[in-house]
Regions:
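Bacterial N-terminal signal peptides that target proteins for export
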Residues: 4-21
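C-terminal motif of bacterial Sec signal peptides marking the signal peptidase cleavage site
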Residues: 29-32
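Bacterial Sec-pathway N-terminal export signals of envelope proteins
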Residues: 34-96, 278-308, 358-359, 384-387, ...
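Amphipathic alpha-helical coiled-coil scaffold segments and their short linker/junction regions
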Residues: 52, 60, 69, 75, ...
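Small/polar, glycine/serine/threonine/aspartate-rich low-complexity segments that form flexible
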Residues: 53-62, 111-141, 264-286, 315, ...
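Sec/SRP-type N-terminal targeting helices
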Residues: 82-83, 99, 146-174, 224, ...
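Periplasmic alpha-helical coiled-coil/stalk elements that build and connect Gram-negative outer-membrane
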Residues: 168-289, 400, 404, 424, ...
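Acidic, low-complexity, intrinsically disordered peripheral segments
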Residues: 262, 281-282, 431, 452-488
């Protein structure tokens, strides 16, 4: 009796292998289809005190045409800015390189070969066929990896955000250059004012020495008073040399900042408006904590774009776990003789498609993900540090703006009082009521007060420069590239 015994049908081993590969691919797809947040880390911010600031060209608020001309010259020729522009061009080329992966790779090739085959080997030539022959080939070769999962689109977006970051980096350099030019300019104006004060004082001391010499020769005063007068004259002459050195250094610094030639740096001549009255005048610049400080600061915006780019690179590293589909094709001619290379029967073509899933390189792919995550974390930490520094800069600059103005007011009052004291001591000395040492002491204190007044006026302007820079002034942040066209 026959029994109909049904045995289980086992799928072939190749089918099991295919299922395993598909399962791995599916698992990789699930793991890779995550999206990394591109927003910068959250930070606690202080309350804003003002809503609007117009500081795009803050240096014009000082009403110093010479300063405006120097800043314009620096923004056109400064070497740090030129280096920043070169970095932008490099980032732009990286975008083009990333975009190239989105298109097929097409090459043209020509080959010529000569070979000999055996008639007695494993695959012998049939009788009558030549053992030696030529082969000529000419054709187009194309390959294209289909961007199924958006790998190359993600790489392109990352490169675009790098480009935006480099553009904000240029604006960071721009704001720094403008501030450094202004600081050097006001330092130079103060040095000029000190020089004029010292030169005027030296002229008075020379007159005093001449007068005291005559009085000593007449026996009215002794050699002690004459020696004191000469010592005071020499002290002022030494101060003039020191002030001149400071002015020379500031002139050469401005020559470097404005991108002038080494010859001009060695023999600089910087146009300026040396006016003590203008230096002592306190300009009015709006101050406070703007509500859009983080938008105004190009260094913060630069790191925001770097965070976006780093997040996209994490996504790109995850997408490498997914299978890739590559299409290849060839179109051309092939013949054993050159004269028949372009005839009808010589035409050849081929087309192929391949699906590849990474298996044995998973460890390296995981390492790439870890590297990308660590790089994003580094940038995120840098972002938090930069935000901290931004608010510290504003806090310190606002405080300096108040304290330097108070110091200038005090020094101005002190100078006026010491001027009165000097005038009285001079009258008393000439009337014979006080020794010459009292006059010298009054002169010395007055000169010191006048010098401190000049430095206090300089510090007021330097504080305003620092405040404008801290508030993100010096660039057109509202119309900056990347503000409305983010590549996220």
């Amino acid at each position: 009796m026959d029994h109909d015994v049904r045995h289980p049908v086992h799928p072939p081993r190749s089918a099991n292998t295919l299922r395993t590969l598909l399962a791995v691919a599916l698992a990789g797809s699930v793991a890779a289809c995550t999206t990394t947040p591109t927003a910068p880390p959250a930070v606690e911010l202080p309350a804003a005190t003002i809503d609007h600031l117009d500081l795009d060209h803050w240096w014009t608020e000082f009403d110093e045409p010479a300063l405006t001309a120097l800043v314009d010259e620096a923004l056109a020729n400064n070497l740090d800015l030129q280096a920043a522009m070169a970095r932008i061009e490099s980032a732009r080329a990286q975008v083009e390189l990333a975009q190239a992966d989105l298109y097929p790779l097409v090459t043209i090739g020509a080959d010529a070969s000569r070979s000999r085959s055996t008639q007695v080997g494993t695959n012998p030539l049939p009788p009558g066929f030549a053992a030696t022959g030529n082969d000529y080939r000419l054709g187009l070769n194309a390959s294209y990896e289909v961007d199924l999962w958006g790998k190359y689109r993600t790489s392109t977006r990352a490169a675009q955000n790098d480009l935006l970051a480099s553009e904000f980096g240029r604006e960071t350099v721009r704001t720094s250059v403008a501030a450094e030019v202004a600081r050097a300019y006001f330092g130079l104006i103060a040095a000029d004012a000190q020089l004029r004060l010292l030169q005027d004082t030296l002229a008075l001391r020379e007159q005093t020495v001449a007068l005291q010499t005559d009085r000593a020769q007449a026996g009215v005063i002794g050699q002690y008073d004459l020696a004191q007068a000469k010592a005071e004259r020499d002290s002022v002459a030494g101060d003039i040399a020191t002030a001149q050195r400071a002015a020379n250094e500031l002139e050469s610094a401005l020559a470097v900042l404005t991108g002038r030639s080494p010859r001009d740096v060695f023999t600089p001549h910087v146009g300026r408006e040396p006016s003590l009255a203008k230096l002592l005048a306190v300009p009015s610049v709006p101050s406070g904590l703007p509500s859009n400080l983080l938008e105004r600061r190009p260094d913060v915006r630069q790191l925001e774009k770097q965070i976006v780019a780093a997040s996209l690179r994490i996504d790109r590293a995850h997408l490498d776990f997914l299978p890739s589909l590559t299409l290849t094709g060839t179109l051309g001619t092939e013949s054993g003789t050159l004269r028949r290379l372009f005839s009808g029967p010589a035409f050849i073509w081929s087309a192929a498609a391949g699906l590849v899933e990474p298996l044995l390189i998973v460890k390296s792919l995981e390492a790439n993900v870890d590297i990308a995550v660590a790089q994003r974390e580094q940038i995120a930490v840098g972002y938090r540090q930069t935000v901290q520094a931004a608010f510290k800069d504003v806090h310190d600059a606002l405080a300096a703006n108040d304290t330097t103005r108070a110091a200038l007011a005090a020094q101005t009052s002190r100078t006026a009082n010491l001027q009165q004291a000097y005038d009285l001591s001079d009258v008393r000395y000439k009337a014979g009521y006080s020794p010459y040492l009292e006059v010298l002491d009054a002169q010395r204190q007055l000169l010191q007060a006048q010098t401190q007044q000049i430095l206090a006026a300089r510090d007021v302007r330097l504080a305003l420069v620092d405040l404008a820079k801290a508030l993100g002034g010096g660039w057109d942040y509202q119309n900056a590239v990347g503000t409305t066209a983010d590549a996220k």
